[in-house]
Structures are given as structure tokens and as C-alpha cells.
């Protein structure tokens, strides 16, 4: 390796190396290689018994090689004369090509005269190799001359950056910056050209990233240096200037290394982790488990597969133990890890039983399928865990920054330092989550972009903090405020880049499923905060809901940009507009009204039902968006995305911790109910229609009354909702997935029934009218009876069997019994509500208005309801199947990282 330090330029070149590092050299060399190869292969079968003679074809080929060599010599002479760098080396290389060309001409001519001579063929082959080596060296040398020219320009920029940093006054600073800008632009053009010619993808990415940093940070260095000159007493300005200067030095080194195709240590590490580690390990494991039974050896394969699996489980455990991973998700990941372990042992046992056989048995094939299914389930849980992190962390990403800036504007340095720690933790969390998303992604190009963006965000974090500290020291300084605004803009832009990059490597289906679940959690928290009169909790949680909704709208709208406009995109965008333009404003209005009412002294009454309705509409809006997005998915994709699970489940469908009565052939009982034959589905639909009639009667009855002071109405509504979920289960829909879920729902109904029985008997005890009293007690007995029946019928899975290895779905009788029991209970609840009201009126007439103080039962007519803001979509309309639209557009990291012109205005 030869290092040339002409004018302090670190130029590395090995004159003996013939490694081709650019596409241009390949293109120029290809025609000559083709011609020489064709000539060498002419009559290559060796000596022939045929009459010797001159080969016209060989002579023609020899002439074409000679002409190609002349063309290279002509271009080489021109390059050597015009080149400012490596002139002597180029002249020597041209002469070497000329010399080898003459030898090749002579050897080719002799071979053409006697193409059957192995000696002459050998001479020509050696001459051809020497010629190709000489031409390659000439082209590489010419290429390095271009690199040398780029490095000279890079040195000019490097010196200009140093002068800008060390400027002694503002006038000198302005002069240096004005001189530096055109030099940076010139370097950018040269580096961009070089970038396009580099063969190695890693070098191209390194060049693109370095160019981006250079273009972005030169104007920032000017601003930071200007601030240092105006406020030399503020240490934060100097620290910022030095940080930016260090980044620029790293960018200069990156351009130098990439141009010469010599990767730095950082770049090598970066490139080494270009793919998702966990995703790669899982993919590789799935390939390794398929082995020919004939060559299977337990001693060789068992330790290897177990070691690979434990490595995967270690990575999954790290994700499970991360601070943002929720408890239920952690349990699912642990369960899936145990399931994968068990599946591997079962698979190895089958391999041992099949060892030495030519073909795999059905049992072995089944074990392989089970193994891949378990790894797929683990992947799904890891993806969902990542989406939990993304949904929580990439939410209101500007809040820590705004709080930090506000403290800085007030000149409170102590607060700035406290909020700086919060801001730093927030930045670290974004970077950690981005890396987690990378680990489970198969999108290599997307992973590179995420990691580059995260690296730039990490470098920007201390600069933002220093800018805030500087503003806190000089809060009245206009320059300090402008400096803070500049870094605020840079931070927000970089966070957007990182957010979009993370969105690109994660599944929108997973994102929407997790977001829907998180919004449901937040809606419930909001309602609880309202009932507990927790103003801060209400305001904070409502803000999170607004942030999540805005994020969903942004992600879905961006996703629709990847599709051709049509019915599908119109449907999705219509759902997003409904959420943003109608639902969210109403929710915001209700939140503001609730906060205002609770904050007043004394607290003002408010319509809790209105708030709950507005909150529920937000959840429904998110769910409608998700339904619209999933319209074009195939059944296989829907299965993978867990569509219709509502994410109410608390464990995986294939978890080893799931009891046997919950799973058959790896499917939830609800999924099996969805597979019933059409004839049986029709019977269930008929029963459901009858149930809906009873539900309508209950709706009509409870809608008359204000439930704010009437626990009987509240309990009736709760029982109605749970019964609806149970009937939905029989149709393969709704939040209840397994038999245990239905049993749990039945227990909840029984508990509600017991509470209603207690309230009803209290009313009956005080009722002076014996007839009304007896009616009410009779209806209460019916509720107890039908709750017991419902509890028995809730075990609907009893009729689903696995016979002869095939799934036999015969759950229709149990399903219809369940619906009938729910229908009877619904009717009993309706009659109980009516009888309770009648008994209460008798009690009032006898005892006077004081009876209205009866605990938890106050009969007040409900005010007329407002018209619904959102027209609910029919279920049938959401199930329309259409063909898949165009695939997602490819995001080029080089293009994304090379958009520099936005900074020209600074």
C-alpha cells in the first residue's frame, strides 16, 4: 500500500492491486475482455487431425483486439496529458499497455496462422492476460486520478471548515463562510458522481450519509461560530461549535474512505449489522430445521439447532425485558419461546424416528409444519411487542423539546438541566425503539436508513441541549433564540425522518392492531379519570388519545400514497377524514368541557354519557380505519394480522399456556365457529335475529331512563353488552376468542344478575302492593335461572372434536343453546326493569317523594338523544373483497439521505 501525502492529502493506493472498485472501470474493460476471451476460445478443442490452414475468424478477432487496444492507448494518452495528478504513473501505464498490445498483436497473429498449435495458443493466452492486466491497471490509475482530484477538493473544504471554526471576528466569519459555500457545493457534485460509480453498496451508503452531514452542518457551524463570537462567555456555544466541527470532520473522513473504497471501522460495524438480527436468525433457523432424514445425525444437528434457538430466545428475552414492553405482551413472548422450545424437541424426536429413511414420514412433515408455525407465532409476538414500543414512544415526540425550550426562554438554568435529562432519555428511547424495530425487520435497505437516521439523531441530541443551555444563559438574545429555533427545526426534521423510516420497516397491519388496542385502553382510562374527577389524568390521557389518532391518520395517509387511486384508497381516506374532521373535534370539545367542569369550584355537573359516546366514537373511528385498510388482504394475510381479534386477547392463540379446551389444531374456538358449514351458520343467524328482537326491546326500555342514578339500568346495559359479545362469538366474531373467554363472560353476567337481584329484592321489600311485589320477585327468579343456564351453555366448545386427524366442526347445537339462553335472559331483564319501575312507583305513592332516596335506584326520564354524528357502516359493506392494489413504493436510502437543497436558504 502506498500512501501519498502531497499537500497533506491522505491518498491510499496499492499499485499492485487490480481490484476494480467502480462501475465505470467495469464498463470500459468489458468489451476488451469479451473480445480477448472470444479469441482465446477459438478452436479451443486442441490439436486437430484436419488439414492445417489459416483461420479467417481468428484473424478477424485478432484485428478487433488490436483495434480495441489502440482505442485504449488513444484515450490513455489523452488522460495522461490532461491529468493534473499522477501524470508520471499514467504515462508509464500507457507505455505498458502499448508494449503488451504489441506482444498480443504478434502472438495473436501467430496463433491465427496456426490455430491448432497448443504452444502458440499458450503464448497468446499469456499475452492476453498481460494485456488485460496492463489495461486494467491503466483504468484503475485513471480512476484514482479522479479520486485524487476529489480528495484535493475535499482538502479545500476541510481547510475552509477549520478557518470557519477559528474565525476571530464576525467579519472574518462571514468572509470564510461565503468562500466555503461554493467549495462545498463543488465537492458535493464531485462526491455525488463518485457515489453513483462505486460498486460496493456500503461505500455508496457511507458516501451518501457523509454528504448529507456535510451539507446540513456547514450552515449550522456558521451559526454556532457566530454565537460563540457574540457570547464568548457562554460555554454551551463553544461546546456546540466543537460538536458540530467534530461531525464535519467525521463526514470528511467518511467521504475520503468511501471515495477510495476503504471502509472505516465505524462503517464496517454499521455494515455488519445491516439486517435485522432476530429476523435473520429466525429465517436461518427455519431453513436449518429441514434436513434429509437419510443424513440426519443427532450428535451433529441437535446441539446446532438448540444453540441457534437459544440465541433467538435470548434476543426475544431482551425485547421482553425492555422497559416499554407491557406485562401481557411479555407473558405472551415467554409462552411462545417455551412453545418453540417444545416444538423443537418434538421435531428432533421425529427426526430420530425417521433417521436412515429416504423419505420423510407424515408425522415428521407435521412436526416441521408445527415448528415453522411456532416460529411464525413468535415472530408475530415480537412484531407486536415492537409495535407496542413504536406506538408509545413515537407519540407526541416534540413535547419534551417544547418543554425544554420553554424553560430555556424563561432563563431558568436549573429547570433546563432537569428537562434536558428528560429530553435525553426521550431521545435515547426513540433510538432504542428504532433499533428494536430493525432487529425484527427483513427490509435490509430500510434497516440501513433507520440506523443512519438514529445515528444522526443521537449526534443532534447534545447539540439541542447545548442550544437550550445557551438560550437559558442569554434569554433576551435574538441570536440565542434564532440558534434555538434552528436546532428545534433540525431536531423535528430528523425525528420525522426517523419516524417515517421506522414506519417503512414495520407492518401497518400490526401498527393499526396495536394502536386500536392502545386507544381502547386510553379511552377506558379517560372514563375512569372522569368518574374519579381526576382532572390531570383526564387531560393527560385525552392528549395521548389525540396523539395516537393523529399518528394513525398520518401513517395511513402516507400508506395510501403507495397505492394507485381507486375505490380502496377512497374508502380508507374517507375513514381517516371522518376521524379527523368529525370525531376528533367532538372528542376534544367533550374533553375541554369535562376539564372545565371538573376544574371549577365547586365542580359543575356534566353529561357523562356524552363524553363516553364521544370517546367510543374515537375507538370506532380507529377500528373503521383498520377495517378499511385490511379490505384488500387475503385470508392468509388476515390470519397473520390477527384481524377480528380486536387485540382483547391476553395470550397467543397458540400459546403453550392455553388450556386444551381452548385450542384445537392451533385455532381459537371462535375461529372454529367461523368455519361452521353454511347450513349451520344459517340456523345460528336465525337464532341471532330472534335474539336481536329481544335486545331491541331492552334497548327501548333502558333508553327511557337516565342511568346516572339508577344501577338497575346500568346493570341491564352491562348484561346486554356481554350477551351481545357471546352471540357474536357463535358467529366467529367479536372479542371473545376461546371457551374460557365465554365462560368468563357468563360469570360476569351472573355477577351482574346477583347485583340486580339484590337491588330488585330491596325494591320488592319496600313495595306495599303485593301483586307488583310478586311479579318482581318472579322475574328475579327467572334471571337467576337463566344466568345458571347461560353458565352451562357457555362451554360451547364441547361439540368441536378432532376425529381421525381431521377437524369435525359440530358446535351448532351448543351455539344455538347459548343464544337461546341469552335470549331468555334478555327477556327476563326487560321484564325486571319494567317491574322494578312499577314497584318503585307504588312505593312512592305510599311513602311520598322521600322514597327517591332509595340507594342506587333513581327513576329519571332521559333527555332526548342527539342525532348521531357518525353513520355506522353496515358489516356487510366492510367485508367487500377487492383485488390487491400496487405494491408499496421502494424508498431509496441514498435518495432520502441526499436531499440537501433544503438547507440552501440558511
From Swiss-Prot:
The modification Phosphoserine is found at residues 264, 295, 297, 641, 652, 655, 851. There is a cross-link at residues 57, 797 (Glycyl lysine isopeptide (Lys-Gly) (interchain with G-Cter in SUMO2)). Sumoylated. Phosphorylation seems to contribute to the strength of cell-cell adhesion rather than to the basic capacity for cell-cell adhesion. It is found in: Cytoplasm, Cytoskeleton; Cell junction, Adherens junction; Cell membrane; Cell junction. The modification Phosphothreonine is found at residues 634, 645, 658. One of its GO terms (cellular component) is adherens junction. Residues 864-880 have a biased composition (Basic and acidic residues). The modification N-acetylthreonine is found at residue 2. Residues 864-894 are annotated as: Disordered. Residues 2-228 are annotated as: Involved in homodimerization. Residues 881-891 have a biased composition (Basic residues). Residues 97-148 are annotated as: Interaction with JUP and CTNNB1. GO terms for biological process: apical junction assembly; apoptotic process; axon regeneration; cell motility; cellular response to indole-3-methanol; epithelial cell-cell adhesion; establishment or maintenance of cell polarity; extrinsic apoptotic signaling pathway in absence of ligand. The keyword Membrane applies. GO terms for molecular function: actin filament binding; beta-catenin binding; cadherin binding; gamma-catenin binding; identical protein binding; structural molecule activity; vinculin binding. Keywords: Acetylation, Cell adhesion, Cell junction, Cell membrane, Cytoplasm, Cytoskeleton, Isopeptide bond, Membrane, Nucleus, Phosphoprotein, Ubl conjugation. Belongs to the vinculin/alpha-catenin family. PANTHER family: ALPHA CATENIN, CATENIN ALPHA-1. Associates with the cytoplasmic domain of a variety of cadherins. The association of catenins to cadherins produces a complex which is linked to the actin filament network, and which seems to be of primary importance for cadherins cell-adhesion properties. Can associate with both E- and N-cadherins. Originally believed to be a stable component of E-cadherin/catenin adhesion complexes and to mediate the linkage of cadherins to the actin cytoskeleton at adherens junctions. Monomer and homodimer; the monomer preferentially binds to CTNNB1 and the homodimer to actin. Component of an cadherin:catenin adhesion complex composed of at least of CDH26, beta-catenin/CTNNB1, alpha-catenin/CTNNA1 and p120 catenin/CTNND1. Possible component of an E-cadherin/ catenin adhesion complex together with E-cadherin/CDH1 and beta-catenin/CTNNB1 or gamma-catenin/JUP; the complex is located to adherens junctions. The stable association of CTNNA1 is controversial as CTNNA1 was shown not to bind to F-actin when assembled in the complex. This is Catenin alpha-1. It comes from Mus musculus (Mouse).
Amino acid at each position: 500500500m502506498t500512501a501519498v501525502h502531497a499537500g497533506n492529502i491522505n491518498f491510499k493506493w496499492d499499485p499492485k492491486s487490480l481490484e476494480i472498485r467502480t462501475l465505470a472501470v467495469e464498463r470500459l474493460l468489458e468489451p476488451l475482455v469479451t473480445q480477448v476471451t472470444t479469441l482465446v476460445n477459438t478452436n479451443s478443442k486442441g490439436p486437430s487431425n484436419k488439414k492445417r490452414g489459416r483461420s479467417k475468424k481468428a484473424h478477424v478477432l485478432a484485428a478487433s483486439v488490436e483495434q480495441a487496444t489502440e482505442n485504449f492507448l488513444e484515450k490513455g494518452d489523452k488522460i495522461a496529458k490532461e491529468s493534473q495528478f499522477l501524470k508520471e504513473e499514467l504515462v508509464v501505464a500507457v507505455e505498458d499497455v502499448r508494449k503488451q498490445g504489441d506482444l498480443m498483436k504478434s502472438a495473436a497473429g501467430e496463433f491465427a496462422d496456426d490455430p491448432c498449435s497448443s504452444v502458440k495458443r499458450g503464448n497468446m493466452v499469456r499475452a492476453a492476460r498481460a494485456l488485460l492486466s496492463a489495461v486494467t491497471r491503466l483504468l484503475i490509475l485513471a480512476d484514482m486520478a479522479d479520486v485524487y482530484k476529489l480528495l484535493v477538493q475535499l482538502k479545500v473544504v476541510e481547510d475552509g471548515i477549520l478557518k470557519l471554526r477559528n474565525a476571530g471576528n464576525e467579519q472574518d466569519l462571514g468572509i470564510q463562510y461565503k468562500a466555503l459555500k461554493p467549495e462545498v457545493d463543488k465537492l458535493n457534485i464531485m462526491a455525488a458522481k463518485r457515489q453513483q460509480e462505486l460498486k460496493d453498496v456500503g461505500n455508496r451508503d457511507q458516501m451518501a450519509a457523509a454528504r448529507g452531514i456535510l451539507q446540513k452542518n456547514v450552515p449550522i457551524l456558521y451559526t454556532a461560530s457566530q454565537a460563540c463570537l457574540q457570547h464568548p462567555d457562554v460555554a454551551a456555544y463553544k461546546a456546540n461549535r466543537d460538536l458540530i466541527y467534530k461531525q464535519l470532520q467525521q463526514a470528511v473522513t467518511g467521504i475520503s474512505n468511501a471515495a477510495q473504497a476503504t471502509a472505516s471501522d465505524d462503517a464496517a460495524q454499521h455494515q455488519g449489522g445491516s439486517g435485522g438480527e432476530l429476523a435473520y436468525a429466525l429465517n436461518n433457523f427455519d431453513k436449518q430445521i429441514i434436513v434429509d432424514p437419510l443424513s440426519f445425525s443427532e450428535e451433529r444437528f441437535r446441539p446446532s439447532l438448540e444453540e441457534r434457538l437459544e440465541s433467538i430466545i435470548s434476543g426475544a428475552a431482551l425485547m421482553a425485558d425492555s422497559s416499554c414492553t407491557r406485562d401481557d405482551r411479555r407473558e405472551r413472548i415467554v409462552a411462545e419461546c417455551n412453545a418453540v422450545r417444545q416444538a423443537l424437541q418434538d421435531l428432533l424426536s421425529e427426526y430420530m424416528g425417521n433417521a436412515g429413511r429416504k423419505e420423510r414420514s407424515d408425522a415428521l412433515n407435521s412436526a416441521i409444519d408445527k415448528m415453522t408455525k411456532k416460529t411464525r407465532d413468535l415472530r408475530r409476538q415480537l412484531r407486536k411487542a415492537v409495535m407496542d414500543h413504536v406506538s408509545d414512544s413515537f407519540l407526541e415526540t416534540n413535547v419534551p423539546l417544547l418543554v425544554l425550550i420553554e424553560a430555556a426562554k424563561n432563563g431558568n438554568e436549573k429547570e433546563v438541566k432537569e428537562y434536558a435529562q428528560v429530553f435525553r432519555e426521550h431521545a435515547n428511547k426513540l433510538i432504542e425503539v428504532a433499533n428494536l424495530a430493525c432487529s425484527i425487520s427483513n427490509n435490509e435497505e430500510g434497516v440501513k436508513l433507520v440506523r443512519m437516521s438514529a445515528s444522526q439523531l443521537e449526534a443532534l441530541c447534545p447539540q439541542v441541549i447545548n442550544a437550550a443551555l445557551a438560550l437559558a444563559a442569554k434569554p433576551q438574545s435574538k441570536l440565542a433564540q434564532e440558534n434555538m429555533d434552528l436546532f428545534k427545526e433540525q431536531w423535528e426534521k430528523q425525528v420525522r425522518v426517523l419516524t417515517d423510516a421506522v414506519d417503512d420497516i414495520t407492518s401497518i397491519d400490526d401498527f393499526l392492531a396495536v394502536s386500536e388496542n392502545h386507544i381502547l385502553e386510553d379511552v377506558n382510562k379517560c372514563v375512569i379519570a372522569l368518574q374519579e374527577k381526576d382532572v390531570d389524568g383526564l387531560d393527560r390521557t385525552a392528549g395521548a388519545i389525540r396523539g395516537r389518532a393523529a399518528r394513525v391518520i398520518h401513517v395511513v395517509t402516507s400508506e395510501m400514497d403507495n397505492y394507485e387511486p381507486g375505490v380502496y384508497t377512497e374508502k380508507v381516506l374517507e375513514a381517516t377524514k371522518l376521524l379527523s374532521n368529525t370525531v376528533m373535534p367532538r372528542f376534544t370539545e367533550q374533553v375541554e368541557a369535562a376539564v372545565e367542569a371538573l376544574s371549577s369550584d365547586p365542580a359543575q355537573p356534566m353529561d357523562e354519557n356524552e363524553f363516553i359516546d364521544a370517546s367510543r366514537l374515537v375507538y370506532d373511528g380507529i377500528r373503521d380505519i383498520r377495517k378499511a385498510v385490511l379490505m384488500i388482504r387475503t385470508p392468509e394475510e388476515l390470519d397473520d394480522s390477527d384481524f377480528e381479534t380486536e387485540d382483547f386477547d391476553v395470550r397467543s392463540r397458540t400459546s403453550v399456556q392455553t388450556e386444551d379446551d381452548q385450542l384445537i389444531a392451533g385455532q381459537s374456538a371462535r375461529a372454529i365457529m367461523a368455519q361452521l358449514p353454511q347450513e349451520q351458520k344459517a340456523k345460528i343467524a336465525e337464532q341471532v335475529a330472534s335474539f336481536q328482537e329481544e335486545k331491541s326491546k331492552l334497548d327501548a326500555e333502558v333508553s327511557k331512563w337516565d342511568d346516572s342514578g339508577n344501577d338497575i339500568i346500568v346493570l341491564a346495559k352491562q348484561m346486554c353488552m356481554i350477551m351481545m359479545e357471546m352471540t357474536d362469538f357463535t358467529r366467529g366474531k367479536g372479542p371473545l376468542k376461546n371457551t374460557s373467554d365465554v365462560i368468563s363472560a357468563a360469570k360476569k353476567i351472573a355477577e351482574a344478575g346477583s347485583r340486580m337481584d339484590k337491588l330488585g329484592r330491596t325494591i320488592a321489600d319496600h313495595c306495599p302492593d303485593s301483586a307488583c311485589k310478586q311479579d318482581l320477585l318472579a322475574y328475579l327468579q327467572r334471571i337467576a335461572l337463566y344466568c345458571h343456564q347461560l353458565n352451562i351453555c357457555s362451554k360451547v366448545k364441547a361439540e368441536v372434536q378432532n376425529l381421525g386427524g381431521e377437524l369435525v366442526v359440530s358446535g351448532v347445537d351448543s351455539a344455538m343453546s347459548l343464544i337461546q339462553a341469552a335470549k331468555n335472559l334478555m327477556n327476563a331483564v326487560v321484564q325486571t326493569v319494567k317491574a322494578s319501575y312499577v314497584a318503585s312507583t307504588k312505593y312512592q305513592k305510599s311513602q311520598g317523594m322521600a322514597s327517591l332516596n332509595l340507594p342506587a335506584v333513581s327513576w329519571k326520564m332521559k333527555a332526548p338523544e342527539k342525532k348521531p354524528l357518525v353513520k355506522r357502516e353496515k358489516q356487510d359493506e366492510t367485508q367487500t373483497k377487492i383485488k390487491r392494489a400496487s405494491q408499496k413504493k421502494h424508498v431509496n436510502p441514498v435518495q432520502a439521505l441526499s436531499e440537501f437543497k433544503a438547507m440552501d436558504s440558511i
